[in-house]
Amino acid sequence: RRGDVMLLINGMPVIHIELKRSKVDVSQATFQIKRYTHEGVFGNGIFKMVQIFVAMTPEETLYFANPGKEENFKPEFYFHWEDFNNTVIRDWRRIVSDLLSIPMAHQLIGYYTIADDKDKTLKVLRSYQYFAASKISDITHKTNWDTHQHRGGYVWHTTGSGKTMTSFKSAQLIANSGDADKVVFLLDRIELSVQSLDEYRGFAGEDEAIQDTQNTAILLSKLKSTDNDDRLIVT
């Protein structure tokens, strides 16, 4: 079998695009990708490096992270790409220019995917998560912190919208950019703190440490520490 379009970054196949003609339901493209997985196309050799799947018709596009196994294909993790105001982009030309362009395609792969160690799956951010994390990181970078006139901000989330992943990715971007010495996840309930700590550690890379604080003394020591492993703190 032969796929339709493969995007390469530095010679490596990372985004597979499956196309269907106009008026054909986009689900046929996702089914085709799932069939390729069943046949082992993405399980061996160089195509095992594919990170993102894109199912596209001229009128509709879905994108999702490579789930690895056929049984892990779940439609609830197929996402439409939306603009900053959460309006679904349907025209394929906008998808190409907004999502599959350079440098956006590079950023999606490099910064806005998460290899979740808990369930051993790759996750990609929804568009609104991308815009939130990107905006927070950008404002943090551009702010003059010497003025002492900076204001706080918030991201409005509903239940099940992925706030844990959004907060982690925002913190990760800020910490890795060097724009902050410390990033603190402040939770208002012990149960939520334990749950979030577990999820954050699943999201973190091999070279990233998420620090827990059992009491005020430990929190103070982590805040004073200059160790890179103490940059991300949950309390």
Where are these regions (language model features)?
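ATP-dependent helicase/translocase motor core
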Residues: R1-K182, E191, Q195-D207, D227-R231
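Amphipathic alpha-helical transducer elements in NTP-driven molecular machines
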Residues: V26-T30, T213-A217, V234
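Conserved AMP-binding/adenylation subdomain of ANL enzymes
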Residues: E206-Q214
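Conserved motor-coupling elements within RecA-like helicase/translocase cores
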Residues: T216-I233
